[in-house]
């Protein structure tokens, strides 16, 4: 039996109705949820939280009015609203909201981030989340699982981003529709574990989860990844699975570097970038987005923020930043970006005529110094 089968109490392929231990949404999805909820329900019967993280503080009157609507709804239904403290997925972890929880639903596709904590976490659309708010439960089809066993330890330049990019390349031609990824023997810290599960939806997986002991029982596919044989990787435009070794695109001129997001905006990741930038000056626009206010505070307390500022980087208030192309750091026509985020589709960070490459924070920081995509091996 897979880990997810144990949590949901059934076999893959079965449909089950289960109570949801936690449901959450953000300022980008909540207006549609409110519209759907008000058509059918009058009372919230779920444990719910709302986070303002996508476009905050409000940059336009239209968005300010939408956020006011969310606040009014939350006040009526006594739902906590957390504003400007960071990205929802990160805050759920920091606030300990998954304690004593097994099933979590978020109104965001990267909700599987929380699978790093060993919970079944999935993203759903506005209508489904509205129903969960009204009923406190929903139906699930139990997904099949791919077991991924990590072996060895990575080199100093390889991070969790490289592991998940490698996995995306392995699963590129495999049908992951309604299948999950279960990771085992993971040697990373929590900061890096969250990157693994955050990124699995880019393989078209239903969710991801990290377990302790691999049994091999009930898995539709098994993969082993030798970490000590991995090198820094880059995803080329316009698909996160379009993965190549960094040396294949080395020398590509870039206009902007973004280090942050729900993928790589935690303290360990940003501090590694800061170590590289310390005492140097960036050659291109370099934007850093802490995943939470707690991360930002620690950056200040431990001197990480100072290193970044003195190197010429701009530190954003905690939130999604330019990742979704709506706020702070949007890119223009023909611009080339190296980003530590999880998506590089056309138009993701602004102009559909821009090109987005994805990498780990170490590669991004080194590239910011040279103004072009640079292999950290040999450069530092």
UniProtKB/Swiss-Prot annotation:
Cofactor: binding details: Binds 1 [4Fe-4S] cluster per subunit.
Cited PANTHER family: HOMOACONITASE, MITOCHONDRIAL (PTHR43822:SF2), HOMOACONITASE, MITOCHONDRIAL-RELATED (PTHR43822)
Subunit record text: Heterodimer of LeuC and LeuD.
Catalytic activity, EC: 4.2.1.33
Name listed for the protein in its UniProt record: 3-isopropylmalate dehydratase large subunit 2
InterPro entries membership: Acnase/IPM_dHydase_lsu_aba_1/3, Acoase/IPM_deHydtase_lsu_aba, Aconitase_4Fe-4S_BS, Aconitase_4Fe-4S_dom, HAcnase/IPMdehydase_lsu_prok, IPM_dehydratase_rel_enz
A biological process term (GO) from this entry: L-leucine biosynthetic process
Protein function: Catalyzes the isomerization between 2-isopropylmalate and 3-isopropylmalate, via the formation of 2-isopropylmaleate.
Any Pfam family matching the protein: Aconitase
Enzyme class, first EC level, given as a word: lyase
GO molecular function annotation: 3-isopropylmalate dehydratase activity; 4 iron, 4 sulfur cluster binding; metal ion binding
């Amino acid at each position: 039996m897979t880990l997810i089968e144990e949590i949901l109490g059934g076999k893959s392929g079965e449909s089950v109705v289960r109570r949801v231990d936690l449901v959450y949404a953000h300022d980008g999805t909540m207006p549609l949820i409110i519209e759907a909820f008000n058509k059918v329900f009058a009372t919230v019967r779920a444990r719910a939280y709302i986070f303002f993280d996508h476009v905050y503080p409000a940059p336009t009157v239209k968005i300010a009015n939408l956020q006011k609507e969310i606040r009014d709804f939350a006040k009526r239904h006594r739902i906590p609203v957390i504003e400007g403290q960071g990205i929802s997925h990160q805050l759920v972890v920091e606030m300990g909201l998954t304690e004593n929880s097994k099933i979590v639903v978020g109104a965001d596709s990267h909700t599987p981030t929380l699978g790093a904590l060993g919970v079944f976490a999935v993203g759903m659309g506005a209508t489904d989340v509205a129903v969960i708010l009204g009923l406190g439960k929903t139906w699930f089809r139990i997904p099949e699982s791919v077991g991924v066993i990590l072996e060895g330890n990575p080199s100093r330049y390889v991070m969790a981003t490289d592991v998940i990019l490698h996995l995306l390349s392995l699963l590129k031609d495999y049908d992951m529709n309604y299948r999950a990824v279960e990771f085992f023997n993971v040697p990373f810290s929590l900061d890096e574990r969250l990157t693994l599960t955050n990124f699995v939806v880019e393989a078209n997986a239903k969710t991801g989860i990290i377990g302790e002991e691999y049994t091999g029982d009930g898995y539709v596919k098994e993969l082993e990844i030798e970490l000590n044989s991995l090198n820094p990787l880059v995803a080329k435009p316009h698909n996160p699975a379009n993965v190549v070794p960094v040396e294949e695109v080395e020398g590509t001129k870039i206009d902007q570097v973004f280090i942050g997001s729900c993928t790589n905006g935690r303290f360990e990741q940003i501090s590694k970038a800061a170590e590289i930038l310390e005492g140097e000056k960036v050659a291109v626009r370099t934007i850093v987005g802490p995943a939470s206010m707690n991360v930002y505070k620690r950056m200040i307390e431990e001197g990480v923020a100072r290193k970044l500022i003195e190197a010429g980087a701009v530190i954003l208030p905690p939130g999604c930043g330019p990742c979704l192309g709506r706020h702070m750091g949007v890119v223009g026509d023909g611009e080339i970006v190296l980003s530590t985020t999880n998506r590089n589709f056309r138009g993701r960070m602004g102009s559909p005529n821009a090109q987005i490459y994805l990498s780990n924070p170490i590669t991004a920081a080194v590239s910011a110094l040279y103004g072009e995509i640079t292999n950290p091996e040999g450069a530092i």
